Amino acid sequence: MAYPGQGGHHYQSTHGGGGGGFPAPHGYAQPGYGYAPPSGPPQGYQSGGGYAPPMQPPPGGVQGQMGYGFAPPSGPIGPPEYATNHVNYNPQGGMIGNQRYEYSSMQGKRKALLIGINYFGQNGELRGCINDVRNVQNFLRQRGYKDDDMVVLTDDQRDARSIPTRQNMTAAMHWLVRGAQPGDALFFHYSGHGGQAKATQGDEADGYNETIIPLDYQQAGQIEDDELHAIMVRPLPVGCRLTAIFDSCHSGTALDLPYVYTTSGNVKEPNVIAGVGKGIMGAAMNYARGDVLGMAKGLFSTFTTAKNTSGAEEVTKQTRSSGADVVMLSGCKDSQTSADATEAGKATGACSFAFLSVMNQYPQLTYKQMLNAVRDVLASKYSQKPQLSSSHPIDMDLLFVV
């Protein structure tokens, strides 16, 4: 199979990496399901500059609630209509400004990239990320994805090309989208640490880019959402599907997709009015206390925040919309952490577990039902709220397929 880094264009990053150029492997095989993680970091491999585990945890902190006993749902998830077989009719595309978008027919080739990082030997070590990858890999096998068309990067492997360093990760992302055609079905799954970095382009309402954190992040840097979008979304043709799942902290807008959906199926609007209301109330209290300067500063800050938030949303819609059919499920909002949990005695990411539980029980759900069901599974144990976003407006009553 074509392999990450073999030929083709490579996105150049300011953080280094993104190249590749290593040859296709001989006898490449994925570990079996009876694997046991090594007691420490894999031995005998080197990443750029000679990788050694850092002494401090990755930025963004350790995913919360580690070791929490998270049992599978005891009964059916959601209302009875979730078990209804939906007809996946041929949906029509539309226009975003002057750009045409199309839903994928899902009849073309299938490719998947699965990344799980436990950060063995680091202070921020996680336990469930590699398990997440194995579980998602099995899920995809049952849905027509072949092992020869799946690349797995985990930090329990001995082959240097299969270690989730920054260079290997970005090269694998290029492999995923290389040669994509209308009707193709691509799948990306990341389970690991997530973080935030100061934004400079004015496209983030909170002023921060969301990041994912490679194994060698201290030497090679984090991977920001702008770069993820540039590699995996921008090159896709009209009508090509990319389904992405990010089970990591601060992952709400990890692909910088412009349309984020509520559980009722509507596009979310930034909560500007609520923020403005609170700011005006504070200014009024300052006025009542005779603090005219405080009142003026409060009003200026309030309306600046409102302007920046709506401005960031407009920039995102103008620069991040795509004719491709890109859908992302993230484990939490940008401001939240995503839990590393325990399910039936095995470590797993809470979001990955919830998604697989829902999809295995109800293979035919609409987008709206899927989002609600995943949230329902998590709601009784965690505060994190999974987010669903897309590159173009989607009909949330359509059948969700991968």
Swiss-Prot record:
Q: Bias regions of kind Low complexity — which residues?
A: 23-45
EC number, UniProt record: 3.4.22.-
Q: Which GO terms describe its cellular component?
A: cytoplasm
What is its EC class?
A: hydrolase
A Pfam family for this UniProt protein?
A: Peptidase_C14
Taxonomic superkingdom: Eukaryota
Per the UniProt entry, what is one GO biological process? proteolysis
Which GO molecular-function terms appear in the entry? Answer: cysteine-type endopeptidase activity
Region (Disordered) spans which residues?
1-79
User: Sorted alphabetically, which keywords does the UniProt record give?
Assistant: Apoptosis, Hydrolase, Protease, Thiol protease, Zymogen
> What are the catalytic residues?
H193, C249
Provide the family line: Belongs to the peptidase C14B family.
The free-text function statement in the UniProt record for this protein reads: Involved in cell death (apoptosis).
What is the designated name of this protein? Metacaspase-1
What organism is the protein native to? Mycosarcoma maydis (Corn smut fungus)
